[in-house]
Each structure stands twice: as C-alpha cells, then as structure tokens.
Amino acid sequence: EISKGDQFSSGFVKANPNSKIPTLVDYTNDKPIHVFESGSILLYLAEKFNNFLPLENELKVECMNWLFWQMSSAPYLGGGFGHFYNYAPEKLEYPIDRFAMETKRQLDLLNKHLENKDFICGDQYTISDIAIWSWYGQLTLGKLYSAAEFLDVSSYKNVLRWAENINLRPAVKRGKIVNKVSGNPDFQLKERHSSDDFKKIKL
C-alpha cells in the first residue's frame, strides 16, 4: 500500500528504482522482466499479447504519437492543475489559472482530433485511448478534481462523446475497481489474481 510506504521497500525498488506506481513484473519469462511507467507498461503488454496496437505502420505511428503526447501532457493536468486546484493547502489564483489554461488547450486539441473519429486512431481502440482516457476522459466525466464545470468540459463535445463510449466498455468497468480502496466497498477489488475475482462484484 502506497499510503504505508510500500513503494520504498527494497523489493519494490528492485522492480522500479523510481519507487512509483504503476510497476509490472512479468514472471512468464525465463527471467523476470521489470516494467515501469504507464506508457512503457501499456506498450509492453500490447506487444506481448498482440492487442490494442495497430499492425499497419502508419496507424501504429499515430498511436505512438498520441501515447507519448499523453505522457508529456498529463503532468500539466495532474501535477499542475490537479494539484493547485484540488490538493494545495492554499488556493493560489496564478497557478490555477495557468494550468487551467493549458488543460483547456489540451482538451481543445483532443476535441478537434476526435471529430468524426470513434477513437484516437480512428475506428480502432488502442493503448493511446487507454492512456488518454485515464486522465482526460475521467476529467470530462467529472471523475477528477470536481473540476468539470470550472473547465467547461461540456463544450468539448467530441471528447465527451469519446469518454462516455469508453466508460461503457465492460473491461473499463472492471478495470476501474481493481486496486480501489475508497468509495463504496461493493465496488472495490483490492487485489485481482484471475478473472474469477470479478464474479464477486456486480457491475
């Protein structure tokens, strides 16, 4: 548990020297493979299981473009806007306005890109959708920082449509409850070891 500092234990640091989550250790190989950073984990799993990654080179490059866009942009949303708007002990106007402006610029970019598209790479759901939805999708659905009204997310209609559609996916519903330790206990799955674990919860 990160609240107890488990990420600083020697076992965790061996898997991820940066002592952050998410971290993955794949034991299905002759030698365990340590994978850390969400983008790296998504790419590793997509290639390992040959899923959620386009096969065509042009679409694969497009997917990588947006995956790495999320990696570089999300800190402005989370560590920037999210921190000063939601977590900082003192509400400071300048950083809130500064990071809100950048977050809205990013949302506008996504909104334009998603026009006439079901997903980031067209009609195919990929790891770029998974990465971007986790932050920007949940933000537009009002699940992050209670900032939907402040950021006027309803004006980004293409992003909202995309976010709502992904939110309805059965795997997304399952994924949202894994390792969840707050909120309604009926929708928490603190550990997941097999697909049978989900049978205990009605989604």
What are these regions (language model features)?
Residues 24, 41, 110, 129, ...:
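Residue-level signal for nonpolar/aromatic packing positions in well-ordered secondary structure
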Residues 77-82, 120-149, 153-160, 165-166, ...:
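GST superfamily/GST-like fold recognition
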Residues 14, 168, 177:
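Phosphate-coordinating loops and pocket residues in cytosolic domains that bind phosphorylated ligands
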Residues 1-107, 111, 118, 201-203:
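GST-like domain detector, emphasizing the conserved glutathione-binding G-site
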Residues 51, 112-124, 170-175:
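Surface-exposed helix-capping loop/turn segments at secondary-structure junctions
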Residues 179-203:
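Acidic/histidine-enriched, glycine/proline-rich intrinsically disordered or flexible terminal extensions
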Residues 46-50, 71, 115, 135-136, ...:
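Hydrophobic/aromatic-lined pockets within catalytic cores
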